[in-house]
Amino acid sequence: MSDKPLTDLTFSSFDLHPALVAGLESAGFTRCTPIQALTLPVALPGGDVAGQAQTGTGKTLAFLVAVMNRLLIRPALADRKPEDPRALILAPTRELAIQIHKDAVKFGADLGLRFALVYGGVDYDKQRELLQQGVDVIIATPGRLIDYVKQHKVVSLHACEICVLDEADRMFDLGFIKDIRFLLRRMPERGTRQTLLFSATLSHRVLELAYEHMNEPEKLVVETETITAARVRQRIYFPSDEEKQTLLLGLLSRSEGARTMVFVNTKAFVERVARTLERHGYRVGVLSGDVPQKKRESLLNRFQKGQLEILVATDVAARGLHIDGVKYVYNYDLPFDAEDYVHRIGRTARLGEEGDAISFACERYAMSLPDIEAYIEQKIPVEPVTTELLTPLPRTPRATVEGEEVDDDAGDSVGTIFREAREQRAADEARRGGGRSGPGGASRSGSGGGRRDGAGADGKPRPPRRKPRVEGEADPAAAPSETPVVVAAAAETPAVTAAEGERAPRKRRRRRNGRPVEGAEPVVASTPVPAPAAPRKPTQVVAKPVRAAAKPSGSPSLLSRIGRRLRSLVSGS
């Protein structure tokens, strides 16, 4: 970014709708930034744009002005229904979508345009009702919008006349490109639809997407002397893993009161670092995928108001968030991707302000440094880790920010936030169920979600399961300790007890409701008894005395019937 972030070109010099000019002026926007000065002359007449500029240079306002002006001065498509959206703005992350929506409402609320914010992690039905009522502009993340378009037909994009893709390179990183292509194919063809694409880097894959789905886009690049903002003072330390927290505390104690962001690489270290800072008296907020969406929004809002001193985050907050007055950005962990380094330090020194970017290159992540320096085309100055820096200075009492005491979340500690997050995640998993459920929510047997401790659904012990019988083994029901087998005659014994290969090819005996089936052998006993089965020594089977009380008459066990049926099928073949 140049030392002069604003140009001499004013918004009033363009042929904008009068209400839009008034809204911009009331919001404090009068002169254009370089990317706005390049974009608006192409986008306002209806041309497609593929724009590249650093974060914090005003890309959001550039496309919002183009979108709103088109909707105000041009009629809608002829086949549009009142509830169909006319414009779609896609962002890769929830935080960026929320930021865009906030900026849009800031100066577009009085223009008569209806905005809808659509993203995951919040009330599904509430967003669906808002879309069904009809909106002019949808600001969304791809995942939730795909669900409304594809699954439930809540919204139709056939009358969407302008589409914006913000942070297109990040769309690729997060795997959203298939979703983007799906949505673009549901809109009018590119000759009718205007498309604006913005990215911090116009890589080959981003340009491929642009030329595939855009109508002869004009490539606009804001030239800079360096990849990183010129007003960011960068420096790097080489601490050991054990020194990182102590060094962070020492540096923070030397910048009391400055709004600070600390970036780490993993969600686990977000909690660990935030807990350490909180124990030393800092008011800390956290942004990571483990924190529920509503809590993330609340913490971000408190940080923007100055009620929180430090925000510890993963790369979920590295792009698109515009937070005024961030003076220090700490890379507690060097990022794996060099582009992420640029986006992280881009949270400070926005729109001509100054800021400091301080990085720690420990033995775990120091291998990323050469790629980062090659990407930004400069060497990052190295500072020594001294004993003085490892000694935190005494903290001065912090003044209470207006409205802080009445904030509902002001008493939330880092431990409370993550404990509630874990409880919420466990409740969500329980609600989804470990296995499938039958009618009424009862668990089905055999679905894979049952208990593994031998207890039934009512908590009582189950009887042991029988081992499946292998072909050729004796039926357990015919063991000597069971009810004896009654043999009709000695001459018939071999036919009844012979091995499977020696049986006569006849229909097996079966019972239906306790009555013999036609063709079955007569039963000597007056009461129904289990059908005879082949013992281990067929030629020596004789009736044996009863050693235990006879079981009540009834059908053979399920396993016995299955085994006999299988043997009959084998012998019949």
Swiss-Prot record:
Start-end of Basic residues biased regions: 505-514
Composition-biased stretches (Basic and acidic residues): 419-432, 450-461
Keyword Nucleotide-binding part of the UniProt annotation: yes
One annotated GO molecular function: RNA helicase activity
Residues spanned by motif Q motif: 9-37
Biased composition (Acidic residues): 402-411
EC numbers: 3.6.4.13
Compartments where found: Cytoplasm
A Pfam family of this chain: RhlB
GO biological process, one term: RNA catabolic process
Superkingdom of origin: Bacteria
GO CC, alphabetical: cytosol
Bias type Low complexity, positions: 391-400, 476-499, 516-528, 541-559
Catalytic reaction annotation: ATP + H2O = ADP + phosphate + H(+)
Keyword hit for Disulfide bond: no
Keyword line: ATP-binding, Cytoplasm, Helicase, Hydrolase, Nucleotide-binding, RNA-binding
Residues annotated to bind ATP: A53, Q54, T55, G56, T57, G58, K59, T60
InterPro entries: DEAD/DEAH_box_helicase_dom, DEAD_box_RNA_helicase, Helicase_ATP-bd, Helicase_C-like, P-loop_NTPase, RhlB, RNA-helicase_DEAD-box_CS, RNA_helicase_ATP-dep_RhlB
UniProt short sequence motif DEAD box, positions renumbered to this chain: 166-169
Renumbered residue ranges of the record's region Disordered: 391-559
Residue ranges, compositional bias (Gly residues): 435-449
Residue ranges of the TM segments: none
Known function: DEAD-box RNA helicase involved in RNA degradation. Has RNA-dependent ATPase activity and unwinds double-stranded RNA.
Assembly: Component of the RNA degradosome, which is a multiprotein complex involved in RNA processing and mRNA degradation.
Family: Belongs to the DEAD box helicase family. RhlB subfamily.
Official protein name in the record: ATP-dependent RNA helicase RhlB
Organism: Xanthomonas campestris pv. campestris (strain ATCC 33913 / DSM 3586 / NCPPB 528 / LMG 568 / P 25)
